[in-house]
């Protein structure tokens, strides 16, 4: 990955999470949405992301899940779910490529779901 690539909030990245994984932590090549702010994305060696899954039929709905259709983004060839309960930092070194971006409305829903995950909304605590 080109270290000078400008990563922006809302970008969809392919990330190499390695072959080893445990439990619900997914390994291999994963699509992820960038949720960290653009100032951090510019200067930090770490990017905060939310993993995506295309297994929409297998997932129970949680308030931390955001459905993403192909029309709401570029770079995905099928509908996916942003798993915002799995927000995580990644090193830039594991980014393989930027493949697209979610639209502003979807990014707003992902932001709200991340806020639910970290306890911003009292009704979910």
What does each model-found stretch correspond to?
Residues 5, 71-125:
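C-terminal terminal-subdomain/extension
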């Amino acid at each position: 990955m080109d270290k000078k690539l400008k990563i922006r909030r809302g970008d969809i990245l392919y990330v190499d999470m390695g072959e080893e994984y445990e439990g619900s932590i997914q390994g291999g090549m994963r699509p992820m949405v960038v949720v960290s702010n653009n100032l951090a994305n510019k200067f930090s060696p770490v990017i905060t992301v939310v993993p995506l899954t295309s297994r929409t039929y297998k997932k129970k709905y949680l308030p931390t899940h955001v459905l993403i259709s192909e029309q709401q983004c570029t770079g995905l060839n099928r509908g996916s779910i942003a798993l915002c309960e799995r927000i995580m930092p990644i090193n830039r070194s594991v980014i393989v490529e930027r493949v697209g971006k979610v639209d502003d409305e979807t990014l707003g829903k992902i932001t709200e779901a991340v806020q639910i995950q970290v306890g911003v909304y009292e009704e979910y605590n």
